[in-house]
Amino acid sequence: MSIIKLVLMRHGSSIWNDQDRFTGWTDIDLSEKGKNEVKYAGKMLKSFGYSFNFAYTSLLKRAIHSLWVILKEINQSWIPVEKSWRLNERHYGALQGFSKYEIEKKYGKNQLNEWRRGFSISPPKINEKDNYFILNDKRYLNLKTKKLLPFSESLKSTIDRIMPYWDGNIFPRLQNKEKIIIVAHGNSIRAIIKILCNLNEKEIIKINIPTGIPLIYEFDYNMVFKKKYFLFDR
């Protein structure tokens, strides 16, 4: 049976991932560990014969640079790439920049877990004077939808942000049987998975996306979901 494969991958580990900090929309580089992760992922995709017609990523360099490495490794740097703020990581509001240890010490373990793993609970909003406030960032200045840019997000609001982009941009290409790779972030990929598999709240909050490992979703030509699997184990 002919199948359509969609490849999803969380960016390689970033400097703040290695420090266990809330990153969100803060634009942090890949760490050396992360660079090695995505290079290996690219080599594995090549060894399994993967090729693509189109690629999607966010406006954050840890995802963009991860995609660049993947495409270089499979010798497809020339394919079209679309970047969108809608594929950015979940915005962690005022938590951005702080380590999980610091937040747990200040607010307690239960509150930390609610902010991290709750479905509809958003952290405190980021303040306009915060060092990591993004509304004046040049990459967002030309957005007609600037009023939609978040100050903090829950997983639910992240899904709501991604849904129209999925419906209007990504899914039509899949229906057209294009071979697509999406390199994004833990929560934006969780959002896509919820949409793909129609998971409920309890199911999606249990999903964990590791850095730098391609996750494959297979569909038949009628876009009926068949199976999913990671390309390799770490």
UniProtKB/Swiss-Prot annotation:
Homodimer. The record marks 185 as: Transition state stabilizer. The active site is at residues 11, 89. InterPro entries: His_Pase_superF_clade-1, His_PPase_superfam, Phosphogly_mut1. It holds the Pfam family His_Phos_1. PANTHER family: PHOSPHOGLYCERATE MUTASE. This is 2,3-bisphosphoglycerate-dependent phosphoglycerate mutase. SUPFAM superfamilies: Phosphoglycerate mutase-like. The gene is gpmA. It comes from Wigglesworthia glossinidia brevipalpis. Belongs to the phosphoglycerate mutase family. BPG-dependent PGAM subfamily. The keyword Membrane does not apply. Its EC number is 5.4.2.11. Transmembrane segments: none annotated.
